[in-house]
């Protein structure tokens, strides 16, 4: 009987030790799992596509790690903000990882404005914030009227992106070249006392009023502007201004130099 008790005791001891070993193993396994490093994924994108780059643009990052994320705009564009799992308006930011991150770099198109005086005027009317040769294209697309007279402007480059512009008044400046082909909504144009020689009105068929006094025009073609009401181009170098047949009667009330004629076949 005593032997049996001893055997049972040894067996119970073995079972107890085995349970203890298993318990310790499980505890060790849990601790080990908790202490293993955790990896997270970084994914980035650019909106609109092609407007800029993000660095780094993707990667695997350990829990708690911090990376420096940078957004750089391509020429003609500007960084606006981060969106997605990051909300910030600074192009270079630090990002600490506690989960997977999907980040979007938002950019906007910029319009080149090389004339500092013109850009200063855009700052004055609230569509720009600093003189750097560029203005936010989305902001100027909404402008319907500009009066930039008596400023000493040489160059109106950038005006092509004012696509809803209806009124442009730029008298008494130093403008010698001007492209209005993209300003198809123009109705009133006043460019008195500049240095202009040529203007193409092919795409400005909505014009109703044109003032071009005191320039250096050698010819003009108004024949596509069917709704023109007022016109004046005194003190220029023109011999002939082209009009269409429907404008003949109206042209009698328009102003020109004595040597200049309105004709359908200039």
Question: Can you name each region flagged by the protein language model?
Answer:
Residues 36-46, 93-109:
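Conserved "repeat-terminator" motif of extracellular CCP/Sushi domains
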Residues 35-40, 106-167, 224-226, 237-266:
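N-terminal capping/linker segments that flank leucine-rich repeat
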Residues 65-93:
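Surface-exposed interfaces of beta-sheet-rich extracellular modules
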Residues 43-60, 88, 119-131:
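Short, solvent-exposed loop/edge segments of extracellular or virion-exposed proteins
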Residues 143, 165, 175, 186, ...:
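Conserved hydrophobic position(s) of the canonical leucine-rich repeat
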């Amino acid at each position: 009987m005593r032997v049996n008790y001893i055997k049972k005791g040894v067996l119970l001891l073995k079972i107890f030790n085995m349970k203890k070993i298993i318990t310790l193993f499980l505890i060790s396994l849990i601790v080990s799992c908790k202490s293993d490093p955790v990896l997270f994924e970084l994914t980035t994108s650019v909106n609109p596509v092609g407007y800029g780059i993000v660095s780094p643009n993707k990667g695997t990052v350990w829990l708690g790690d911090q990376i420096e994320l940078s957004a750089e705009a391509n020429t003609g564009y500007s960084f606006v903000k981060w969106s997605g799992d990051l909300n910030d308006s600074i192009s270079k930011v630090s990002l600490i990882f506690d989960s997977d991150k999907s980040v979007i770099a938002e950019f906007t198109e910029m319009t080149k404005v090389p004339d500092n005086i013109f850009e200063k005027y855009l700052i004055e009317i609230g569509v720009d914030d600093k003189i750097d040769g560029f203005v936010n294209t989305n902001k100027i697309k909404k402008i319907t009227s500009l009066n930039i007279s008596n400023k000493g402007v040489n160059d109106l480059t950038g005006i092509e992106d004012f696509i809803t512009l209806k009124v442009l008044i730029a008298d008494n400046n130093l403008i010698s070249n001007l492209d209005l082909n993209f300003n198809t909504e123009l109705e009133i144009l006043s460019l008195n006392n500049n240095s202009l020689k040529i203007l193409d009105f092919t795409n400005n068929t909505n014009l109703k009023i044109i003032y071009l006094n005191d320039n250096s025009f050698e010819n003009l073609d108004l024949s596509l502007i069917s709704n023109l009401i007022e016109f004046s181009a005194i003190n220029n170098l023109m011999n002939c201004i082209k009009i269409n047949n429907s404008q003949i009667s109206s042209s009698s009330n328009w102003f020109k130099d004595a040597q200049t004629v309105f004709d359908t076949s200039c």
